[in-house]
Structures are given as structure tokens and as C-alpha cells.
């Protein structure tokens, strides 16, 4: 079978393209602060949504900071999730009133690729703007995790986009 020399040549194009795409994604995400509202009894959904991004951010040389209210991250879970164990920092037992202030300070430093904090209440526009500004300064991403009880979600009207997938139909 004959193949042309063009087809057999090695090229750095795919690697260059991959690196450029990764850099573009990291730069586009920097300064992003997003709130993830999830059912208290279904935390796996939030994990499924965030883990791919957290894995990608884990390729940076910076830390990932988890500000958790009570639970301590399991070493086994971090490793099995594909997150870099050597780059994950956690501060647990943080009072909710200190989480926002801690997130702002951590995002602003630039030492973290991502800062994840748990909040029980919705943020005001001013609080959200402070987080966004800090994330821009630190070239970082912030995630506000807000667990809600199932009945709390059914009481309020949500505006949003429904994403339909043929994957499940």
C-alpha cells in the first residue's frame, strides 16, 4: 500500500493546537465566578459538572483551594477523581460568614487556579461583583457551591435554559 510522504510526516500542529486551545480556555475562564446550586441529597451532579474543569485547571502550577463548611476531602476521592493531590488545599470548619471574605482574598492573590466555597445564602450583586473583581485580579476561577433542599427549589420560579440531549432519549 502506498501512502504519500505528506500523510506520514510528523507534525507538531495537533500539540500546538491542543496547547493553544487549553491556554485559550484557561484565559477565557479567568475572572469567572459561577454559582452552582444543587440538591443537597444529590451532590454527585455538581461533581460530574465540575470535575472536568477542575482536572484541566489542575494542570496549572497553581493550587486549588476548597473552603468547606464541615466535610473534609477524602484523599482517596481526590486521587480517584483525577485531581492533583499535591495541588489541592482545603480549609474546613470555616464559618459561613467568613467564606466570602476568604474567597475574595484567595482569588485576589493569584496563587490559586480555582477557589471553591460553600455558601448557604444567595449572594448580593455587590458580593458577586467583589468576587468577580478578585478573580480577574488573580486570573482565577471561583465556584460558589450552594446546596438546597429539594422542596426549596420547587417553591421558586427559575429562569434559565433547558439543555436537551439525545444522549438520554
Curated annotation (Swiss-Prot):
* Pfam family of the protein (one): SulA
> Its GO biological process terms?
division septum assembly; DNA repair; negative regulation of cell division; SOS response
What are the boundaries of the region FtsZ binding?
A: 106-112
Inducers of expression: By DNA damage, as part of the SOS response.
Q: Where is this site: Essential for degradation by Lon protease?
A: 169
Q: What does this protein do?
A: Component of the SOS system and an inhibitor of cell division. Accumulation of SulA causes rapid cessation of cell division and the appearance of long, non-septate filaments. In the presence of GTP, binds a polymerization-competent form of FtsZ in a 1:1 ratio, thus inhibiting FtsZ polymerization and therefore preventing it from participating in the assembly of the Z ring. This mechanism prevents the premature segregation of damaged DNA to daughter cells during cell division.
This protein's name: Cell division inhibitor SulA
What is the taxonomic lineage of the source species?
Answer: Bacteria, Pseudomonadati, Pseudomonadota, Gammaproteobacteria, Enterobacterales
